[in-house]
């Protein structure tokens, strides 16, 4: 199947190609998804470890059980994104948020 991911700000094609599924396509291209429009995407159980999601639009995306270890989510739009409570620490780290105690 053919897939494409567009840039969130300009609607230009960021990446296009073929894969068996959208999940597989995203995993194969996770190295540079900065400014990607992934709004409303079902990314549950997707391996996004080390993904560059800087300024990506992940609003309303399903990120439950996605592996976000060492991902860069800085300045990403996560409005109404769905995650599991067990992912909260990974998300905080990926957003580069420092918790002060």
Report residues per predicted region:
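Intrinsic low-complexity/IDR segments
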Residues: 1-36, 54, 69-70, 74-101
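Periodic short-repeat tracts
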Residues: 35, 39-70, 75
């Amino acid at each position: 199947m053919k897939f494409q991911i567009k840039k969130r700000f300009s609607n230009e094609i960021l990446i296009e190609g073929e894969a068996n599924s959208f999940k597989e396509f995203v995993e194969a291209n996770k190295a540079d998804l900065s400014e990607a429009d992934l709004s409303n995407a079902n990314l549950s159980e997707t391996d996004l470890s080390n993904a560059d999601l800087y300024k990506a639009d992940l609003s309303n995306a399903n990120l439950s059980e996605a592996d976000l270890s060492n991902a860069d989510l800085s300045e990403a739009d996560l409005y109404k994104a769905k995650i599991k409570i067990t992912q909260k620490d990974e998300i905080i780290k990926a957003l580069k948020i420092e918790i002060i105690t």
